[in-house]
Amino acid sequence: MPVEENYQPLLQEEEERAYDSDEKVLIIGVDSDTESGGSTVLPPFSWKKLWLFTGPGFLMSIAFLDPGNLEGDLQAGAIAGYSLLWLLLWATAMGLLVQLLSARLGVATGRHLAELCREEYPTWASMVLWIMAELALIGADIQEVIGSAIAIKILSNGFVPLWAGVTITACDCFIFLFLENYGVRKLEAVFAVLIGIMAVTFGWMFADAKPSASELFLGILIPKLSSRTIQQAVGVVGCIIMPHNVFLHSALVQSREIDHNKKDRVQEALRYYSIESTTALVISFVINLFVTTVFAKGFYGTELANSIGLVNAGQYLQDKYGGGFFPILYIWGIGLLAAGQSSTITGTYAGQFIMGGFLNLRLKKWLRALITRSCAIIPTMIVALVFDTSEDSLDVLNEWLNVLQSIQIPFALIPLLCLVSKEQIMGTFKIGPILKMVAWLVAALVMVINGYLLLDFFFNEVTGVAFTTVVCGFTGAYVAFIIYLISRGFTCFSRCCPSKQIEVE
């Protein structure tokens, strides 16, 4: 039987890569008449080039605005008032540092974190890292899809139940696939619109609430932390660094066509990615600040503060601030829907890179996206059916999901910091001793904070001899694997990467 000309095999013959060459945004050639492509001198700044590089940072910033972060914001505002705004600022700065290192890894090597983990670690360790990354992604995806489903329920006046909202949200996978066929810039434009919707809706709420400007600035400038607000402080930091986002950003930066063998081109890409990532996270900080201050103004010091959560936040806002020209309940619902939809799509995107990178799956992208979406949507549907009528149970589940993601953070941060520190991997773009020390201090701080969250949670939730034994056994294996990853980081990676030096023609 003759093979049809339009037939597309499910398996690709070449090795898995983040983007095919025909999918990348062309950078080489812009202002080429004024640049000496092989020079070691950094080309002059160009607004046109900044525009061409703009996109990956905004996709990355979605993880700072997902429903899990919004819940952390509203609880911090309701319970701690304005006092944790300084921590939100510094947590965002720490998140920016981690994401810039992730981008640096992707630009300098031409490969993303999942690929490098597969190549540089033994097979067994690589598989453990993959499983941990997938678990973190599934946990994040459940929160994101449930957040969208809650928003749909709000906007439909309760007519659409959670399970139906989950089904509707699951269809965004196919919208994402459709958009990607028209180019990565179209997809990035959609995310820009969704971020704009969040900025407008939460900014509208901020304007309606009229929070105290003096208390706001004092909260940002003066560090303050009491024993009563430690849990909210841990939540603020814990929500900022998402394991799957570290993998995602190192892949997103490869959507631009640059010559990785020319030092000036790599330096130029790093400069523009640093500018656009910083801009994106400044915007995300402002949006998170809007949410925190609205709930600080409305609920701090009230009896409702300890009971507020993502499920009932809209109704509490409506009761506090009233209807007005456009009811604040629906403004909140629209912003929450934009947050849930955008983060769900980026979760699907991250799932493709994680699965493809660790397993070297040479599948067509639509099939890989379908597989990753199915892995996440099935447990989410079960959650929606079980917890549809129980708000308290849904909040407890959310705590467990936060714990699940906190457990995974070292398995993204440690490989990243080890890889960007090695000349065998990064060549001349390895991080220097000062940046290395700062990065490890940030990573240690994040892991200690999340460790506190885990200990506090397990002391309160783990009961019974059998359950305690299982948790202790898991903890021992967990700590041992972290020690292995750190110790390996002080040895040379040499399985697949001989000493790499950037050549300048």
Curated annotation (Swiss-Prot):
Tissue: Expressed in roots, stems, buds and leaves.
Range of residues in the leader sequence: none
Record keywords: Ion transport, Membrane, Transmembrane, Transmembrane helix, Transport, Vacuole
GO biological process, one term: defense response to bacterium
UniProt feature coiled coil, ranges: none
Topological category with respect to the lipid bilayer: Multi-pass membrane protein
Domain of life the protein comes from: Eukaryota
A Gene Ontology molecular function term of the record: manganese ion transmembrane transporter activity
Cellular component terms per the entry's GO annotation: plant-type vacuole membrane; vacuolar membrane
Keyword Magnesium appears in the UniProt entry: no
Annotated transmembrane regions: 50-70, 78-98, 127-147, 159-179, 187-207, 233-253, 280-300, 321-341, 369-389, 400-420, 439-459, 466-486
Keyword Cell membrane annotated: no
Cell compartments where the protein resides: Vacuole membrane
Main location class: membrane
Catalytic activity, as annotated: Mn(2+)(in) = Mn(2+)(out); Fe(2+)(in) = Fe(2+)(out)
The protein's role, per its UniProt record: Divalent metal transporter. Can transport manganese (Mn) and iron (Fe). Involved in the release of metals stored in the vacuole.
Sequence similarity: Belongs to the NRAMP (TC 2.A.55) family.
Matches recorded under HAMAP family: NRAMP
The protein's name: Metal transporter Nramp3.2
Phylogenetic placement of the source organism: Eukaryota, Viridiplantae, Streptophyta, Embryophyta, Tracheophyta
Gene designation: NRAMP3.2
